[in-house]
Regions:
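The catalytic core of metal-dependent phosphodiesterases that act on cyclic dinucleotides
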Residues: 198-262
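Nucleotide second-messenger and two-component phosphorelay signaling modules
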Residues: 27-30, 70, 102, 114, ...
């Protein structure tokens, strides 16, 4: 990582270099390779006074992290909304363990209906966060929790809630349908994922036929192998599987050819 500070009239020239410039690598200067960088740019407003250089660095770090996620040679400019987003993300990560312990996350069931008969034939478990009397939209907290392994804790919590609901409905003599529970791809590197899933289901004494695990497409060859292992393991236990967001991940045709989704 490099940080540079310069007068704004040089900005266009600097950005041209950052986006890519041929650099010779032999003594004669005839062999060249194109070298580029991703960069975050903070244009310091005229007349701004900072107490310390860290205030500037914080802004650069936010925007450079965003630039690194883009394609090669990307340049992103800072604006104050980015600081607000970062502060909100940090707050969510800080209060998440307490919110989970307080059971602020609730399960909503979205029905799957057979359009020919009108019968409910299944459901998908959706997570909603109740905080201070209001619902926090999923897009405000799911992407934040996916930045680390917090999302895995939430997924397991949701699976446990679904298992408890299913067992309660069965005990009440209600007609129960299969419920799908979404698991983030963040789980896939976990070598004991299958064991963790089955422990939650079996500790609740939930009949396997009422659970479906919904997994998101992978983006790498290694993760694809992990996904394949988990799906085969779940099906050996009588747990149905489905694929979420099909068509946006890695090797979509292999995904449906090599893995026996339900």
């Amino acid at each position: 990582n490099f940080v540079a500070i310069f007068r704004d009239h040089l900005l266009e020239q600097v950005l041209e270099i950052i986006k890519g410039i041929p650099v010779p690598y032999d003594p004669a200067g005839e062999k060249r390779v194109n070298v580029s960088a991703n960069a975050g740019v903070y244009v310091i407003p005229e007349g701004t006074v900072f107490e310390n250089v860290g205030d500037i660095i914080n802004r650069i770090m936010i925007v450079s992290a965003l630039a690194r996620k883009e394609e090669e040679g990307s340049v992103i400019f800072y604006d104050d909304r980015m600081m607000e987003v970062r502060d909100r993300s940090m707050r969510i990560q800080r209060i998440f363990p307490m919110a989970l312990a307080a059971k602020e996350f609730k399960v909503f069931y979205q029905p799957k209906v057979d359009v020919t008969t009108g019968r409910i034939v299944g459901a998908e478990a959706l997570c909603r966060w109740y905080r201070d009397g209001k619902i926090v939209p999923p897009m405000d907290f799911i992407p934040v929790l996916e930045q680390n392994l917090d999302i895995c804790q939430l997924d397991f919590y949701m699976l446990d809630c679904v298992c408890k609901d299913i067992c309660r409905w069965l005990a009440e003599g209600k007609e129960v349908v299969r419920v799908s529970v979404n698991l983030s791809r963040k789980h896939l590197p976990d070598a004991d994922l299958l064991e963790h899933i089955m422990t939650i289901i079996d500790d609740n004494q939930t009949p396997h036929q009422y659970i479906e695990i919904e997994l998101t497409e992978t983006t790498t060859d290694v993760a694809f192998k992990d996904l394949k292992r988990v799906v085969y393991g779940l099906q050996a236990e009588g747990i149905s599987t489905s694929v979420d967001d099909f068509g946006i991940g890695y090797s979509s045709l292999n995904l449906i050819r090599e893995i026996p989704w339900n």
